[in-house]
Amino acid sequence: MKINILNKLARFFLIFGFLLAYNANAEIGGDFTLKDYNNNKYNLYSSSKEKIIFFGFLNCPDICPATLSEVSNLLKKLRGLSKRIDPIFITVDPERDKPDLMKNYLSFFDERIIGLTGSQDQIEKVANQYHVYYSYQDKGKKDNYTV
């Protein structure tokens, strides 16, 4: 039994190590400037705080609210340490996720979560920097489309 577990662990770390080495040169992230839900410019590198960055959209039925709840719980568990963190929510649906709606929505989870938006091109550029993929279905149906 112990040997079986050790075998599985060895395989896991071998595969994990390979994936890390394979992706070692892949650059993910980088600086950006978007607008927050108060219409102020937010530059990622303007603060020395650690960042938790989450891409999502307000009409997301399950994964986005569940993840925002996890971020909120993490901030509560960190207590005073949470002052050293900027939790950031970047919308991938800037047409529908207007700043006032985003501010109201995020306040249900935690007032410290910073909601960011921009033009469709700006959001796409930042998403590409972070290797985030999203798409729209039925975009021609005004506000009745899926992300």
Which functions belong to the PLM regions below?
Residues E50, A66-I90:
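Conserved helix-turn-beta segment immediately C-terminal to the redox Cys motif
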Residues N43-V71:
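Short active-site neighborhood of thiol/selenol oxidoreductases, capturing the structured segment around
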Residues R11-A21:
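Bacterial N-terminal signal peptides
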Residues K2-F13:
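Bacterial N-terminal signal peptides that target proteins for export
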Residues K83-D97, R112-D121:
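Thiol-based oxidoreductase modules, predominantly thioredoxin-like and allied folds used
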Residues N23-S46, S69-E70:
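N-terminal "domain-start" segment that seeds a small globular fold
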Residues K103-V147:
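Short, internal strand/loop/helix patches
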